Amino acid sequence: MLNIHDLTLIYPDGTRAIDSLSFALGKNENIALIGENGAGKTSLLLALAGVIEPTSGSIEINGLSFTKKKLNEVRKQIGFVFQNPDDQLFMPLIYDDVAFGCRNLGMDECEIETIVDETLAKLNIGHLAKRSSLKLSGGEKRMASIATVLAMSPSVLLFDEPTAYLDPKAKRALVQALNNLEHPKIIATHDMPFATQVCNRIIVIQNGKIMKDGDLSLLTSEELLKKYGL
């Protein structure tokens, strides 16, 4: 599904955000990417989403390598939900936010309407279609931001701190929504209870390196969590 091999990312100022990192995401896997602030989680997601180009190493999804020539094709297979929902909600109405990517691809408006309606229904937010994001709660914004990504039919979903800005009720709705989505997921999070509810694999990152990779039992080790600032 998604294979990362010997990935390294060094920023212009010399910061080594990702350091020779390798792992694979399987078809039925939901990975919680955990680590203290500055560990490299967001940098990794940005590289996997094709937003920034790694210094070296390789990324492959469904047999397709991330190269400049194929980058647009690759990006269609990766859905990236940013930490701040407002980064993906900038149109007058939620309907237009969700339709935005489809329109950029030149899809027929009738087809777009069907896709938007089905996507919003899948997340139980059809009632938000004709509303502005400026009038939505944090939880509603989060669901709408996910819808903008789902409408593009990605193969893999990436999330950067999806529970940020959410109250307990909104978190419960998010857990239910993510568990209903069959897409493999990589979720960067500091929210351990949330991780146990939506993920079946844990990767601990520190200084851009994978320190631990295993099942949910990793989250029961107080010594491990303390060691890596979690």
Where are these regions (language model features)?
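Conserved ABC transporter NBD signature motif
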Residues: 57-66, 74
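Catalytic Walker B motif of ABC-type/P-loop ATPase nucleotide-binding domains
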Residues: 157-160
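H-loop/switch region of ABC-family ATPase nucleotide-binding domains
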Residues: 189-190
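Conserved ABC ATPase "signature" region
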Residues: 110-128
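Helix-to-loop junction immediately C-terminal to a conserved catalytic motif
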Residues: 49
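Conserved beta-strand-loop-alpha-helix hinge in the C-terminal portion
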Residues: 209-230
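Conserved ABC ATPase signature
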Residues: 132-136, 140
